[in-house]
Swiss-Prot record:
Name of the protein: Glutamyl-tRNA(Gln) amidotransferase subunit A
Family matches, as Pfam families: Amidase
Assembly notes: Heterotrimer of A, B and C subunits.
UniProt entry tagged with the keyword Transport: no
NCBIfam families per record: gatA
Organism of this sequence: Clostridium botulinum (strain Kyoto / Type A2)
Signal peptide: none
Gene Ontology biological-process entries: translation
Cytoplasm keyword on record: no
UniProt-listed InterPro entries: Amidase, Amidase_CS, Amidase_dom, AS_sf, GatA
Length: 485
């Protein structure tokens, strides 16, 4: 039995039945990382000794017949912008190279409380800015289905770790699609929760009104398990909602009779690969055959979402990243003439091209002469997009669309084509701008590459997403696929 190919709920079953030890599971994953990660590039840091130590502690509890917790003995990878005490937290940037976190993020605390085994920190686009993980300052992450293709981004390492069987579960962050798009490209399940459902405390900020931590797993049940473990109010993050977190496992039923699903025409227009369209339309038919009521709908302002997103996120990034200046935080240049030179050279040496591009754009739209024309107007557009979604959700329980207009593209194909790269998030960005939840799960294969189905629902209706996603998943076998790597 290959332990690395099992889901979290399968591992929980054999652990609780004492068919395997937590240490055995952990060592299997560490061996797998040592075997394949030089080619896949999922990890930036591996915490081997600590992982084995924690696994041994869980084995002692099992021997004493103590009750296991939600994640006991389950190997988890953490994106390298989420703090884990004693581990590096570089955001895949040279400016934070060598930084070790002195504390745990709230989500990390929750994973540790539920006895998940944290294997290490995962590769990403620098400061979560990118859609391919090609912007990592340290190494490329490769798609396990085809090593010549990208895994998506910015949580590319998080997707590769799960798809490449280097972790059972992982955490990513989603600002404009950074959990859902790599989940789609790598053939796994990824959730962007409602803004405020999961704490951002201890997560290095990119766009503070957009960032959300998102769970990733091999199937819907795994994703629901991790969401239940980390969701909820955090008094250290005033943007978290004081709303009870349901037991998402109860949502995992095959009953979707009467659920109303909207199909927005704006998500099926020009630019969508025809084979992707066909795969998504076939998935919609499955949901309809299983009892859902499917009707067309319209979100007419979606064409403006991408522009609003890049204005708002870049403005917030320029503000958030101002602290990395060589004085307060981050790399300090060794060759400087005066104080101004420290700032200039430290940031020039420390940040990559994409981060510099977005800082400059953000600074521009926040400047006195352009604030009203760009940033203020983008906030107004955002409000209208939110209203658009609310209007649709008066008539529908969920909306279904492709996650990405294409399957995974080749490494280097879009690296120098900024607009083409940005357009790869065209179906995920509107959801982030509105702050509503969405899940991506596999719905097909095209030329050996996975296709992602995106299901979107109203605020704090993650249970609806899990219900519909689970129903579809149980009707097909795409979630059982494993990259032959």
């Amino acid at each position: 039995m290959d332990l690395t190919k099992l889901t979290a709920h399968e591992l929980k079953d054999i652990l609780s039945n004492k068919e395997v030890k937590a240490e055995e599971i952990t060592r299997a994953f560490l061996d797998r990382i040592n075997l394949v990660d030089n080619k896949l590039g999922a990890y930036l840091y591996v915490s081997e000794e600590e992982a084995i130590k924690k696994a041994k502690e869980i084995d002692v509890k099992i021997e004493k017949n103590e009750e296991l917790k939600a994640l006991s003995g389950i190997p988890v990878g953490i994106k390298d912008n989420i703090n884990v005490k004693g581990m590096q937290n570089t955001c895949a940037s040279k400016i934070l190279q060598g930084y070790t976190s002195p504390y745990d993020a709230h989500v990390t605390e929750k994973i540790k409380k539920e006895e998940g085994i944290i294997l290490g920190k995962l590769n990403m686009d620098e400061f979560a800015m990118g859609s391919s993980t090609e912007n990592s300052a340290f190494k490329l992450a490769k798609n396990p289905w085809d090593l010549e293709r990208v895994p998506g981004g910015s949580s590319g390492g998080s997707a590769v770790a799960v798809a490449g069987c280097e972790a059972t579960l992982s955490l990513g962050t989603d600002t404009g699609g950074s959990v859902r798009q790599p989940a789609s490209f790598c053939g796994i399940v990824g959730l962007k929760p409602t803004y405020g459902r999961i704490s951002r405390s201890g997560v290095v900020a990119f766009g503070s009104t957009l960032d959300q931590v998102g769970p990733m797993g091999k199937d819907v049940e795994d994703c629901a398990l991790l969401t239940s473990a980390i969701a909820g109010l955090d008094k250290k993050d005033f943007t978290t909602a004081d709303k009870e977190v349901p037991d998402y496992k109860k949502s995992l039923t095959k009953d979707i009779k009467g659920k109303k699903i909207g199909i927005p025409k704006e998500f099926f227009g020009e630019g969508l690969d025809e084979k992707v369209r066909k795969s998504v339309e076939e998935a919609i038919k499955v949901l309809e055959e299983n009892g859902a009521e499917v009707k067309p709908c319209s979100l007419p302002l979606m064409d403006y979402a991408l522009s609003a997103y890049y204005i708002i996120s870049s403005a917030e990034a320029s503000s958030n990243l101002a602290r990395f200046d060589g004085i307060r935080y981050g790399h300090r240049s060794k060759n400087f003439k005066d104080a101004q030179d420290i700032y200039l050279k430290s940031r020039s040496e420390g940040f990559g091209d994409e981060v510099k591009r977005r800082i400059m754009l953000g600074t521009y739209v926040l400047s006195a002469g352009y604030y009203d024309a760009y940033y203020k107007k983008a906030l107004k557009v955002r409000k209208l997009i939110k209203d658009d979604f609310q209007r649709v959700f008066k008539d529908f329980d969920a909306i279904v669309s492709p996650t990405s207009p294409t399957t995974a593209f080749k490494v280097g194909e879009k690296k120098d084509d900024v607009m083409s790269m940005y357009l790869s998030d065209i179906y995920t960005v509107p959801i982030s701008v509105a702050g509503v939840p969405a899940i991506s799960l596999p719905c097909g294969m095209i030329d050996g590459l996975p296709v992602g189905l995106q299901i979107i629902s109203d605020y704090f209706k993650e249970d609806v997403l899990f219900n519909l996603a689970y129903n579809y998943e149980q009707s097909v076998d795409f979630h059982k696929m494993r990259a032959d790597f």
